[in-house]
């Protein structure tokens, strides 16, 4: 590497221009071979830097989202679940519900694809550079109860309120103690008409009193979550079973 190239690389490092620092020499050589103008060369350098920063930003948001696994909507086999409205799911992935702070409720039996769809929507939001956090209902409640115990609940609630999309998975598998239910309601109520939330549940709404045993609190939770909500029913037949069966038939 020449002294001039080394100096440019050092300047790029100081300015945190990672892509330009690694690409300027090869792009300069290519520009010389193709007889490109200085402006063309500069544009290529800057475009590469922008694309690299966007890629790293999305990667960071995906990491911060704490997704259980990387399952995109492109991987979801809608043909195996024709009753799930593919067009509605793809429309949601465009992100309008995020701008309008509308809830999304995925309701269906275990194994029907709720978590996959929720994860896919979360990934789509990360690609749109939104701050996303994925959690199970049980894990979220445990965090809130612990925060209340060590007197850091206000800070915890502010942290969750700052996220542009929360995915609460597996609501309904276990009943919630009244204190836990009230804390979860605080998170949900704080987001009403302010920020989006996705909830997956195996229970129809008529059975939510099994989870929120306080009738008044149950009604309040349902009111917040169903107002202006996108409600997607994933059915009762296992998506995982049908997909596995389909793969075996192809073998």
Spell out what each predicted region is.
Residues 17, 29-32, 47-51, 81, ...:
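Non-catalytic alpha-helical coupling and interface elements of nucleotide-dependent molecular machines
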Residues 6, 10-13, 22-25, 40-44, ...:
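Solvent-exposed alpha-helical segments within well-ordered globular domains of core cellular machineries
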Residues 52, 57-91, 99:
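Clamp-loader machinery-focused feature within the broader ASCE/P-loop NTPase space
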Residues 84-162, 211:
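Conserved P-loop
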Residues 9, 17-69:
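Interdomain "pre-motor" coupling segment immediately N-terminal to P-loop NTPase/helicase cores
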Residues 1-10, 247-251:
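Intrinsically disordered, low-complexity and often Lys/Arg-enriched segments
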